[in-house]
Amino acid sequence: MLMHEKLMAGQFFDLKTDRKPLMHHHQYQHHQQQPLHHLPHSQLPVQGSLGLPKMDLYTAYAYQQQLLGAALSQQQQQQQQQQQHQQLQQQHTSSAEVLDLSRRCDSVETPRKTPSPYQTSYSYGSGSPSASPTSNLLYAAQMQQQQHQQQQQQQQQQQQLASLYPAFYYSNIKQEQATPTAAPPKVTPTANLLQTFAAASAAAAAAAAASSTNSPRPASNASTMQIDVLENPLSPAVEATTPTTSSSGEAGKNTRPFKAFPRDPLVIAANFAATDVLLDNPRVERYTEYRKRVLEQIRSSNGGSRTVTNPKMRRTNSRSGSVNEGSSSNNNSESEDRAAAEESSDCDSQAGNFESKSATSSSSNLANATAANSGISSGSQVKDAAYYERRRKNNAAAKKSRDRRRIKEDEIAIRAAYLERQNIELLCQIDALKVQLAAFTSAKVTTA
């Protein structure tokens, strides 16, 4: 057993016997001398190792470091010699090669003073053509051989170091093998946590979006306001908030600015209308009476309807109803006429087909032409009917929105007129009170 092996094995300090392990080492070698005499001369240990027990701990460690340094220097010299030998072989092979015109100009042996545009920072100034990136494919086999030789040299170095310094070297190898295996489990839990967090956040976002789509906005509820709700402003809040089913489908749409107003016309007219409702009930009753009278006047002037489609044409409900009935009857009659025309055209086309079998070719051509014209006319009639139906629905929706806007405008105008009347009445009361106060003070002064 050599000194450096005892150093790494930790046999220099014997805590149980409290003796110096160098003496044990000397006795061990003395007992081992008899079997060593029978060994051949090549297997005998070095005589310098016999003097190691006489050395101190620090001197033995220094001697061990010298041995390691000498071995490493010898290996480096051998590597340098091998590299020089390989470079010389490559130069001889490149000089002996025939001129190949397929090679690019940047693979020339002599480096240029000005670098070519094909050369990179790696290929410029390289001594061999294998160093250029363009000719790496040609020398792939040589590169593989060089890598294989380097791997063999590294393995030899590891074996030599292991023979010189076994305990320290093998412990390092075990640690290096343990570190990469322990690294992946540290990464995977964090990745799993990130995945679960991303899934949870996505689920929360989806739930929030679903709740926002299902819950109607208060602004969209204003679009479902009915006329009778405006005509009865003192209805309870439960009735005002009932039509939420139709507004749930319109939650995704953007409301118009005028439709975003609240339902209560008192709040539309003035900001302090709500305070009037809470504080002064008689004033609210007077306002409702005034509003009813104004609405009756509007209906009488508009012919019994709340709004007028065209102010220049005063139509009553009866006339509008008769007109609507007449239009519906006309539409029905037109549809019946169209169906009859289609049937007649079909009959004519069939009759023409039957006659064409017995008649001449001219009559068959005329029948085909009439059938084609009748088909085109029927298709155009269907298209016209669909177009007029779309126009009718669009006009009805436009009239509905226009009527709602005019109702709101009327409510605001009614509230403004009422507030003006109240202002005039209050001013008159203030003037009367001032006169009474002046008369009272003058009478009091005269009596005093």
UniProtKB/Swiss-Prot annotation:
Disulfide bonds: none
InterPro entries in UniProt: bZIP, bZIP_sf, PAR_bZIP
Biased composition regions of type Basic and acidic residues, renumbered to the chain: 100-112
Single GO MF annotation: RNA polymerase II cis-regulatory region sequence-specific DNA binding
Record region (Basic motif): 390-406
Signal sequence region: none
Transmembrane segments: none
Annotated spans, Leucine-zipper: 407-414
Localization terms from the record: Nucleus
Boundaries of every bZIP domain copy: 384-447
A Gene Ontology biological process term: regulation of cell size
Region (Disordered): 23-47, 83-134, 238-259, 298-363
GO cellular component: nucleus
Biased amino acid composition, Low complexity: 30-47, 115-134, 318-333
Keywords linked to the UniProt accession: Developmental protein, DNA-binding, Nucleus, Phosphoprotein, Repressor, Transcription, Transcription regulation
Protein modification: Phosphorylated at multiple sites.
Polar residues biased stretches: 298-310
Sequence similarity: Belongs to the bZIP family.
Quaternary structure (record): Homodimer or heterodimer.
Biological role stated in the UniProt entry: Represses the expression of both the krueppel and knirps segmentation gap genes. Binds, in vitro, to the krueppel regulatory elements CD1 and CD2. It is required in the early embryo for the development of portions of the head and abdomen.
Protein name: Protein giant
Protein source organism: Drosophila melanogaster
